Amino acid sequence: MAEKVLVTGGAGYIGSHTVLELLEAGYLPVVIDNFHNAFRGGGSLPESLRRVQELTGRSVEFEEMDILDQGALQRLFKKYSFMAVIHFAGLKAVGESVQKPLDYYRVNLTGTIQLLEIMKAHGVKNLVFSSSATVYGNPQYLPLDEAHPTGGCTNPYGKSKFFIEEMIRDLCQADKTWNAVLLRYFNPTGAHASGCIGEDPQGIPNNLMPYVSQVAIGRREALNVFGNDYDTEDGTGVRDYIHVVDLAKGHIAALRKLKEQCGCRIYNLGTGTGYSVLQMVQAMEKASGKKIPYKVVARREGDVAACYANPSLAQEELGWTAALGLDRMCEDLWRWQKQNPSGFGTQA
């Protein structure tokens, strides 16, 4: 009997790619989403998941739901028997979190507490949590390994992820029947090789690469480069970009880890290589054959100069490694953008 996995926020960018990998691995994903960061489309399924069904030939169960809606979550856990929960749902824009801290704490913290309480009440004690490299704050050393101090976060988004990590650690400490894998993502980019699903930001993109690809396709005039006076090779911010398909596969490896009664485990999901903003622009120009105009503007509050992973623990303990390099990330991202110039709302 295939195991049911609840995926919160599963219609979004990372969520939809993970749902596809879950289906390919033989799981039965049940997805909830409130469309805050996902395109609705005209059918009964979010457009991203409708396309996932087409790509896999398998069906996805979906319910529109907000993780702050306790009654709806209760009904969901009564209806289904879940083996595990993969928790993506939450607000995720660093800059916005500085402007709207309460929103971030309400959705990310309260939503997660409610989810954990309902999981506990129904005896579902296996969790994969979508955390972030922002929990490390300003790096004291690079590459970042899991032993690097956390909590010196530079923005409320990162703090909310840090607080949730601490809650889950405390929960696993207090009740040894809980198992949790906390995945600290670096910077996901790229798209499924088919070009059918990808990142479709609702509004102005907060992340570099969707913005770059929208400039390349002509949706936006020029890229704003936030600061060129960082202590990096070319003065622009350096990040560890990871292909979203590699990232999604990391969640399948994490589910396998839960079966070992692993307690609380934490892993970086990154490539171990940092690229600057200007290197990413050049790589995208190469993949698209387009010139990408940019202008340098002031630094963005809460940004760090450089951040990249030591991913060796995930390689050792999860048997996971990032297989897709920079060229492939940009080629796949460009294919998605070209086939879907207006994102999921593109009319065929």
From Swiss-Prot:
GO terms for biological process: galactose catabolic process; galactose catabolic process via UDP-galactose, Leloir pathway. Homodimer. NAD(+) binds at residues 12-14, 33-37, 66-67, 88, 92, 161, 185. SUPFAM superfamilies: NAD(P)-binding Rossmann-fold domains. Changing residue 90 to E: In GALAC3; 800-fold decrease in UDP-galactose epimerization activity. Catalyzes two distinct but analogous reactions: the reversible epimerization of UDP-glucose to UDP-galactose and the reversible epimerization of UDP-N-acetylglucosamine to UDP-N-acetylgalactosamine. The reaction with UDP-Gal plays a critical role in the Leloir pathway of galactose catabolism in which galactose is converted to the glycolytic intermediate glucose 6-phosphate. It contributes to the catabolism of dietary galactose and enables the endogenous biosynthesis of both UDP-Gal and UDP-GalNAc when exogenous sources are limited. Changing residue 81 to R: 5-fold decreased catalytic efficiency for UDP-galactose epimerization. Keywords: Carbohydrate metabolism, Disease variant, Galactose metabolism, Isomerase, NAD. Substrate binds at residues 132-134, 185-187, 206-208, 224-226, 239, 300-303. It catalyses: UDP-alpha-D-glucose = UDP-alpha-D-galactose; UDP-N-acetyl-alpha-D-glucosamine = UDP-N-acetyl-alpha-D-galactosamine. This is UDP-glucose 4-epimerase. GO terms for molecular function: identical protein binding; protein homodimerization activity; UDP-glucose 4-epimerase activity; UDP-N-acetylglucosamine 4-epimerase activity. The active site is at 157 (proton acceptor). Changing residue 51 to W: In THC13; likely pathogenic; decreased UDP-galactose epimerization activity; decreased UDP-N-acetylglucosamine epimerase activity; reduced NAD+ binding; decreased thermal stability. Changing residue 132 to A: Loss of activity. The keyword RNA-binding does not apply. InterPro entries: NAD(P)-bd_dom, NAD(P)-bd_dom_sf, UDP_G4E. Belongs to the NAD(P)-dependent epimerase/dehydratase family.
